[in-house]
Amino acid sequence: MTRVLKAKKRKAQSGETRSAVVFLHGYGANGADLMGLADPLADHLPDTMFVAPDAPERCGAGPFGFQWFPIPWIDGSSETESMDGMARAVADLNAFLDAIMIDHDLLPEQVALVGFSQGSMMALHVAPRRPDALAGVVAFSGRLLAPEQLPDEVATRPPILLIHGDQDDVVPVQSLPEAAEALEAAGFAEVFAHIMRGTGHGIAPDGLSVALAFLRDRCGF
């Protein structure tokens, strides 16, 4: 049985929802952490609803945040616990996305994922394995997990934008070209990348501007 994800929502500014951006937060954070990104985006995406779920588990490394799955080198969990946790979170997120589409009468091509760090890892894992292609994925400061499995498991190939800070000391910037190479090897025709100069493990204004352009031009929002 999947777990129901609690989420913050911001209605479409125009009053008519024609698309949705689902923010997926990083390890130890919560949905509210990324919902602030809706402020600079909403004026440019008036028909877009913004949704930011909390990950399904309390963070093992701290009492206040959430995690999509355990990270062994941070919280002392085992590799098996981490893999099992991710499998459960994938099912939870897929159920959440299905519910968003049903509740708001949206098609998969009207829904985009915007992730940060561990949330990006979830987005890059979930989107290609869904049977109907989502509008796109924006992955800030993440990595593609189990790239060797992707060619055999990919079901759809939505446009993907990878964004990373060149000073990231949490998830190395080399994760970006590694993900791009694996995606292209798996047949993804639309893989875009942007490096945020002088940026650590975070989201800089230039990265957000590129994400906005992607959502408008490639996702049709």
Model-assigned labels for residue ranges:
Residues 101, 109-156:
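Primarily recognizes the serine-hydrolase "nucleophile elbow" in alpha/beta-hydrolase
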Residues 1-110:
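Serine-hydrolase catalytic machinery in alpha/beta-hydrolase-like enzymes
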Residues 177-221:
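C-terminal catalytic histidine-bearing segment of alpha/beta-hydrolase fold enzymes
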Residues 36-38, 172-182:
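Short alpha-helix in the alpha/beta-hydrolase fold that links the catalytic acid
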Residues 18, 109, 155-160, 189:
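Short, proline-enriched alpha-helix->beta-strand connector loops that line the catalytic pocket
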Residues 162-164, 168:
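Short beta-strand/loop motif that positions the catalytic acidic residue
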Residues 31-32, 148, 204:
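Short N-terminal helix/helix-N-cap motif within the alpha/beta-hydrolase-1
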Residues 53-54, 114, 138-141, 163, ...:
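Alpha/beta-hydrolase-fold catalytic nucleophile elbow
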